[in-house]
Amino acid sequence: MQLITTENKLAGSKKALEIIEKGITSGEVNTLGLATGSTPETLYAELVKSDVDTKNVTTTNLDEYVGLAANDPNSYHYYMNELLFSKKAFKESFLPNGEATDAEAECARYEEILSEHPIDIQVLGIGTNGHIGFNEPGTPFDSLTHKVVLTDSTREANKRFFEREEDVPTHAYSMGIKSIMNAKKIILLAFGENKAQAIKETIKGPVDVNCPASVLQNHPDVTVILDNEAASLL
């Protein structure tokens, strides 16, 4: 596990972009795994400005809310299109289908996509409770793509994106921890003081399902990029 501490979110995002650009330019990155939320927004803005050619790169996404259409402004389809896909050309892009009526079939479909497009670099954020994707504390490490019941803390953290609290979805489709760990390389981004405790448990704590991100200690190629605040408890 390589640890990089930077001055702020912009510097950290640029450092992540350097790794991604190098992988794409060298031809080592054919599939790029993407995350959502506030953490990677600056990375995507920098990627849009970058000269790196992504038209032969396939993207996959970690998760999507259950029940939200792709054109819903709160869906991750919409988020990705607004921040990245409408501004940068990729070969093809895959996300779970939030409108799928058969959850089991949708999870199997997405796992098939992941097997056809092995992830070369997976970008991750981390929740204040240590979740990666929507894999909440207690999620088995051998989990594949599955339908998740969102915890109160995760819904609380995400309610700022919705007009009303009751509009925050209760479920999501998420790549499982095993699905994430199958990526050849992982870049974990964390910025801000509110992520410091989760980062401490991820890097220095035991590998335990109560902090899902701690499993990254077992991955052969992880780069953790922090700002000074997120690194403050290390």
Curated annotation (Swiss-Prot):
Transmembrane segments: none annotated. InterPro entries: Glc/Gal-6P_isomerase (IPR006148), Glucosamine6P_isomerase (IPR004547), Glucosamine6P_isomerase_CS (IPR018321), NagB/RpiA_transferase-like (IPR037171). SUPFAM superfamilies: NagB/RpiA/CoA transferase-like. It catalyses: alpha-D-glucosamine 6-phosphate + H2O = beta-D-fructose 6-phosphate + NH4(+). GO terms for molecular function: glucosamine-6-phosphate deaminase activity; identical protein binding. GO terms for cellular component: cytoplasm. Coiled coil: none annotated. PROSITE patterns: GLC_GALNAC_ISOMERASE. The active site is at 63 (proton acceptor), 129 (for ring-opening step), 131 (proton acceptor), 136 (for ring-opening step). The keyword Hydrolase applies. Pathway: Amino-sugar metabolism; N-acetylneuraminate degradation; D-fructose 6-phosphate from N-acetylneuraminate: step 5/5. GO terms for biological process: carbohydrate metabolic process; glucosamine catabolic process; N-acetylglucosamine catabolic process; N-acetylneuraminate catabolic process. Pfam families: Glucosamine_iso. Keywords: Carbohydrate metabolism, Hydrolase. Gene3D superfamilies: 3.40.50.1360. The keyword Manganese does not apply. Its EC number is 3.5.99.6. Belongs to the glucosamine/galactosamine-6-phosphate isomerase family. NagB subfamily. Catalyzes the reversible isomerization-deamination of glucosamine 6-phosphate (GlcN6P) to form fructose 6-phosphate (Fru6P) and ammonium ion. This is Glucosamine-6-phosphate deaminase. It comes from Listeria monocytogenes serotype 4b (strain CLIP80459).
